[in-house]
């Protein structure tokens, strides 16, 4: 009886894990703003207002991230700069591999849904994003 109890507990723990799968990756497409950053020491920085946001576009296992500034009329100011990345899976975890002329870095996707996602950097910093909702004052 004790073994059955342990098996049920283990199944529950594994089932509750928020695992990202390949079908979730298109959720990355769109405009995102940082909600908060969690540092390795446990401290957090909350972001209530963002003057710049990220636009992410993914096709298959490649994509780019571009920083844009939203306007109050629903448009965005942007530049031609973009950070290209590839997505690869390693032991069931999806990773973003960025490479620019100046740098290269990796982030693990630890949670991904239609309206939120979390990545963790190589420095063990967690970035919590929420889907950006534009403010249009001209309506």
Model-derived features with residue positions:
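Positively charged n-region of N-terminal signal peptides that target proteins for export
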Residues: 1-5
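C-terminal motif of bacterial Sec signal peptides marking the signal peptidase cleavage site
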Residues: 12-15
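N-terminal helix-cap/turn-to-beta initiation motif at the start of protein domains
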Residues: 18-33
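Residues located in well-ordered beta-strands
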Residues: 31-33, 108, 128
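Short, solvent-exposed loop/hinge segments that bridge or flank secondary-structure elements
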Residues: 34-62
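Acidic surface patches and DE-rich sequence motifs
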Residues: 39, 100, 121
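Contiguous, well-ordered beta-strand patches that form the walls/edges
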Residues: 61-116, 124
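Edge beta-strand at a domain terminus
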Residues: 120-139
């Amino acid at each position: 009886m004790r073994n059955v109890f342990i098996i049920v507990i283990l199944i529950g723990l594994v089932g509750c894990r928020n695992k990202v799968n390949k079908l979730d990756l298109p959720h990355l497409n769109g405009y995102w703003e940082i909600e908060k950053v969690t540092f390795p020491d446990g401290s957090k920085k909350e972001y209530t207002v963002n003057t710049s946001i990220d636009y992410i576009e993914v096709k298959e296992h490649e994509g780019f991230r571009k920083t844009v500034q939203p306007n109050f009329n629903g448009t965005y100011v942007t530049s031609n700069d973009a950070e290209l990345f590839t997505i690869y899976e390693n032991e069931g975890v999806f990773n973003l591999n960025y490479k620019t002329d100046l740098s290269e870095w990796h982030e693990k996707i630890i949670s991904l849904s239609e309206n939120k996602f979390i990545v963790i950097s190589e420095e063990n910093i967690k970035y919590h994003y929420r889907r950006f909702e534009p403010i249009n004052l001209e309506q």
